[in-house]
Each structure stands twice: as structure tokens, then as C-alpha cells.
Amino acid sequence: MTDQDSTYRPRSPDLSTFQSSIPPAVNSPIYPLASPLAHRASYDASPFFAPQYQQPPAPLGRVPQQYIPPFVDPNSPLSPDMARRSSRLARATEVAPMPEVSYAQPVLSEEPQQLPPPPPQPNPVASIEVKTKFPVARIKRIMQADEDVGKVAQVTPIAVSKALELFMISLVTKAAKEARDRNSKRVTATHLKQAVVKDEVLDFLADIIAKVPDQPAGGRKHDDDGSDQNEQPKRKRGGRRPKDDSD
């Protein structure tokens, strides 16, 4: 290879004969190509330094103005009309008041408290023991003597004896209450009569108690003393006759 090929470098093209058909945007001075300012003059920096297009600001919108009613002299003749008009406008724009909501407290139905049942009262008849029983054999003979009864079962006289016993206890207990109310220490026929009269269950004894005389006025004194009305006075025992003095 030759020295020219070994030291090869590209040659700059010759632009002296090239003429641009587009006129330059900015009139710049023409420098000869041999001048050192020729390369700098060919650089067009007008696009970078040209002022950019700025959009004109939009016109400001019209600010709404609040309507202020003109001042009206209260002494002028137009003031009543204006007042009525203002009152109508005020009533039209007035918001109806909301109805008051009242909270109704729920009523709780209170259940009545159930009282405990009272303890069963002991039966006074059950606590009384009768030592002398009604004779069952005699009750049986009395029942068999009745023509309407005829034969009697073995258990029947026993049940009748127990029923008579309970009836006697009930009647005597009521008569004893009458005696206590009258401050008497004994139960008499008069007390039995008062007990039968006050109890409707014992009305079947009305014919029997009708034969019992009412208690006399002085009977209360005998009851208080604990004496019996039917009790007869005791006879005094006679003593020995005094011996006559013999002469």
C-alpha cells in the first residue's frame, strides 16, 4: 500500500458550488468558506431563540353580583307594598319546621309477682284423739233394725262410727269457740245451740236445738264461776241430834 492509503482520511466535500434553493430564515452575513467563522455562521439558532407562541389569556368570566334591595325610606308611600312583598317572599322561602319526633318509651308489662301458696293449715280435727269410740256392734244392730236397710256389710258400721266421731269433734269444737267468746270455762247446751245456728251445714239439727232453752240472764255468772246450770244443789248431811240433858 502507498503512503496515501495508510494515512487515509475522509475528505470534506466541496460545498462551494451548492446553492440552497430555500432562503435562510434569518438574514445572516455570508462569510467565505475559507474564513474560520464560516462554520459558525452556517449554524442557524433562530428556532431556539425565537419567542414561543403564547396563547392569550382567556377573558375573565363575569362575576355574579348579589342582589341588594334598594333602601326604601319607611316614611315613603311605597314602604307598605315593599313590606308586604318582602313578607310574601319570606313566607315562600321559609322552610316548614320538621315535626318533633317524640320517643315513646316502651311500657313493660309487669307480671304480678306470684305469691307463694300459704302453708296448709293443720286440721284441728285430725289432732284430736277420741278415747271413747262409738260401738260398732250397736250401730250395726240399729241399722239392721231398719226395714229399708236390711243386711249391712261388715265395713259399713265402722265407716259410720268414724263419721259420727268426726261429726262430734266438729260440733264440740265450734261450741267450744262460742264458750271462749263468752268467757265460759264449760261447753253447755246453749253453746251447742249457738254453734248450730251459725253453721248452715248443721241446719238439720234445727228441730233438736229448738227444744233447748235460751241462756238466762244470770247464766253468764254461773259460766264465769265454772258451775253447771243443770247441777243440782247438794243436800246437807244431817248430823247427830244433840242428846237431851237428862234430869
UniProtKB/Swiss-Prot annotation:
Residues annotated as region Disordered? 1-31, 48-82, 212-247
For bias type Basic and acidic residues, the affected ranges are 1-12
Instruction: For this UniProt record, give its keywords in alphabetical order, as a comma-separated list.
Output: DNA-binding, Nucleus, Transcription, Transcription regulation
What is the disulfide pattern of this chain? Answer: none
Disrupted gene: resulting phenotype?
Results in a reduction in growth rate. Leads to a multidrug-resistance phenotype, including the azoles (itraconazole, voriconazole and posaconazole), as well as the salvage therapeutic amphotericin B and terbinafine, an agent used in the treatment of chronic and allergic disease. Also leads to transcriptional derepression of cdr1B and its over-production. Also results in a notable increase in the immunogenic properties of Aspergillus fumigatus, but does not result in loss of virulence.
List the GO cellular component terms: negative cofactor 2 complex; nucleus
Q: Which GO terms describe its molecular function?
A: core promoter sequence-specific DNA binding; protein heterodimerization activity; RNA polymerase II general transcription initiation factor activity
On whether Transcription is a keyword of this UniProt record, the answer is: yes
State its location(s). Nucleus
Biased composition annotated in UniProt, kind: Polar residues: 13-22
On the tree of life, the source organism's domain of life is Eukaryota
Q: Entry's Pfam families?
A: CBFD_NFYB_HMF
Listed GO biological process terms: transcription by RNA polymerase II
In terms of InterPro entries, this protein maps to:
CBFA_NFYB_domain, Histone-fold, Transcr_DNA_Rep_Reg
Subunit structure, interactors included: Forms the NCT transcriptional regulatory complex with nctB and mot1.
Physiological role: Part of the NCT transcriptional regulatory complex that acts as a key regulator of ergosterol biosynthesis and the azole exporter cdr1B. The NCT complex binds the promoters of genes linked to azole susceptibility, and especially represses the expression of cdr1B transporter.
UniProt record similarity statement: Belongs to the NC2 alpha/DRAP1 family.
* Name of protein: NCT transcriptional regulatory complex subunit A
Source organism per entry reads Aspergillus fumigatus (strain ATCC MYA-4609 / CBS 101355 / FGSC A1100 / Af293) (Neosartorya fumigata)
Its gene?
nctA
